[in-house]
Amino acid sequence: MKKQFAVMFCLLAIFTCLVGCSGKTESLFPSAFVRAVGQEKADALKTLGTTEQALSDYTVDVYGKTADVQLSFDAYRGDETSAGKLNYAELTVPCTPNGDGFSYMRTCYNKLEKALGEPFTTDVNMDGVSAEDDTDTLFAALQKDAGGENICALQYQWRGLGENESLLYLYYYPNEDGSARVKLTFLPKERAQIP
C-alpha cells in the first residue's frame, strides 16, 4: 500500500511540475527592451524560436547605438554586429479593407508602419526598387509580387552586411470576415538560406 502511495505521489509531483513549467517555455522580453520601446510595442512584437539572452544581446547591440530608441525598421535590420542574433521575430497587425486592393494594402502597411515606428523605408534594397524610392513605389512592388490569392509578400534584402546579411518579409493575410492582418518577419542569413 505504501509503495502504491509513493508511486501515485511521484506521478502527481511530475504532473504538477509539467503543468507549472509549461507556462515558462515562451520567451519573455528583457526589462531593458520593454523600457526602451515601451510596453505597448513590446506586447505587439511576438518572438518565436529565440531565447531571452539572444533577444537581449540583439537589443543591446541595436539600441545601444541608436539615439532615437524605437522599435523600427533599423531595429529589425540590425547592423554588422547585431544582425542574425534574433532567430525569428514577427509582428502582426489587424487592418480593414477600403476601396481597391492598393488602398487596402496601403492601409495595412500604414498600420504596420505605425506599430513599428515610422518611417521604415530607409536602407531598403530590393529588385528594381532603390533606397531612395518612396513608400508608394515599395508598396506597388509589394502588390505586384503577390505570391498567391491569400498571401502578398515582399522580400527586403539588406546588402553589404557580409555574413550577417538578412531578409525581412512582409506578408498580407486577408480574413474571411473582410478584415486582414499584416505580418513582418525577420530572418538571419543562415535561416533564410541566401545564396
Question: In which residue ranges do the predicted regions lie?
Answer:
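Long, charged/polar, surface-exposed segments that mediate recognition or autoinhibition
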Residues: 67-154
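A glycine-biased structural micro-motif
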Residues: 35-39
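Bacterial signal peptide processing site
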Residues: 22-24
